Amino acid sequence: MVTLYGGVEGGGTRSKVLLLSEDGQILAEADGLSTNHWLIGTDKCVERINEMVNRAKRKAGVDPLVPLRGLGLSLSGGDQEDAVRMLMEELRDRFPYLSESYLITTDAAGSIATATPDGGVVLISGTGSNCRLINPDGSESGCGGWGHMMGDEGSAYWIAHQAVKIVFDSIDNLEAAPHDIGYVKQAMFNYFQVPDRLGILTHLYRDFDKSRFAGFCRKVAEGAQQGDPLSRCIFRKAGEMLGRHVVAVLPEIDPVLFQGEMGLPILCVGSVWKSWELLKEGFLLALTQGREIQAQNSFSGFTLLKLRHSSALGAASLGAKHIGHLLPMDYSTSAIAFYSYTFS
């Protein structure tokens, strides 16, 4: 009888399941809707997981009544012990044929396990931002990830908000803008389709949509690429804020992570990283300064990586490892390095 291992990438918008053979071959995949239990509740979350795994089983030519050997789930909110325990109980009680064993981890743990064998830093900058350190022993610590009301520094939302605020404060004569506001002001009116600042208030309060507001970041990026000094300045500052998140976790990093040939592996997740060239100056500045204070001797360099495979792959590998089976992983195909730096 065929032995299968499964992995789930549980996102806030979309989810993915991969089924693997014992020798690490991907046999089937299935896509689905959000499986974030904070957004949709535990019941719907486990139903969607069961439905996706069964769909993948059928694609792999396996009877849905034959349980997987192990299922690893990489879920946002997978670090809340009570919620994880409840999810496990629901999966076992309601769907006894789904899998023989389960491991639920954070989305960051699944991501890094897809990219490297020993852990590293996951630095997320999409609509929001977050930084998670996963040490070789599986222990985690982090900085950020508290949402737009408390932070999300360096994210698309933060960049959009900075741009809008600099324009408002400059017109009010509250704070002088570091550069001419002309481009950003006009881009702001065009993007939100309003004639003046009062029109923007609708988008900030009555009709507030975080993703839509964060989307203005794209217009700031376009300005920066065209050479607008204010847009470039905002992105440089965003790079600095993201770098400071890495500096914040330096004291917690197992020295082993500094010693590989790539230096500290930093996995970059989220669409803001598409503008790496605009973030670069501020990012390097923050890490160079932070390193002098925090970890000068051991922190000699780093490599930025991006995933080429779903983090469901890393989740499957962690789920298998949890029951003593090592799935062969080809890290060179599952992640790609796009920037390396050695401190002088």
Swiss-Prot record:
ATP binds at residues 13, 127, 214, 271, 275. Keywords: ATP-binding, Immunity, Innate immunity, Kinase, Nucleotide-binding, Phosphoprotein, Transferase. Disulfide bonds: none annotated. GO terms for biological process: defense response to bacterium; innate immune response; N-acetylneuraminate catabolic process; positive regulation of nucleotide-binding oligomerization domain containing 2 signaling pathway; response to muramyl dipeptide. The modification Phosphotyrosine is found at residue 205. Pathway: Amino-sugar metabolism; N-acetylneuraminate degradation. The modification Phosphoserine is found at residue 76. It comes from the Eukaryota. GO terms for molecular function: ATP binding; muramyl dipeptide kinase activity; N-acetylglucosamine kinase activity. It catalyses: N-acetyl-D-glucosamine + ATP = N-acetyl-D-glucosamine 6-phosphate + ADP + H(+); aldehydo-N-acetyl-D-mannosamine + ATP = aldehydo-N-acetyl-D-mannosamine 6-phosphate + ADP + H(+); N-acetyl-D-muramoyl-L-alanyl-D-isoglutamine + ATP = 6-O-phospho-N-acetyl-D-muramoyl-L-alanyl-D-isoglutamine + ADP + H(+). It is an enzyme of class 2 (transferase). Its EC number is 2.7.1.59, 2.7.1.-, 2.7.1.60. N-acetyl-D-glucosamine binds at residues 36, 107, 129-130, 145-147, 152. The keyword Iron does not apply. Belongs to the eukaryotic-type N-acetylglucosamine kinase family. Converts endogenous N-acetylglucosamine (GlcNAc), a major component of complex carbohydrates, from lysosomal degradation or nutritional sources into GlcNAc 6-phosphate. Also has N-acetylmannosamine (ManNAc) kinase activity. Involved in the N-glycolylneuraminic acid (Neu5Gc) degradation pathway. Also involved in innate immunity by promoting detection of bacterial peptidoglycan by NOD2: acts by catalyzing phosphorylation of muramyl dipeptide (MDP), a fragment of bacterial peptidoglycan, to generate 6-O-phospho-muramyl dipeptide, which acts as a direct ligand for NOD2. Homodimer. This is N-acetyl-D-glucosamine kinase. It comes from Bos taurus (Bovine).
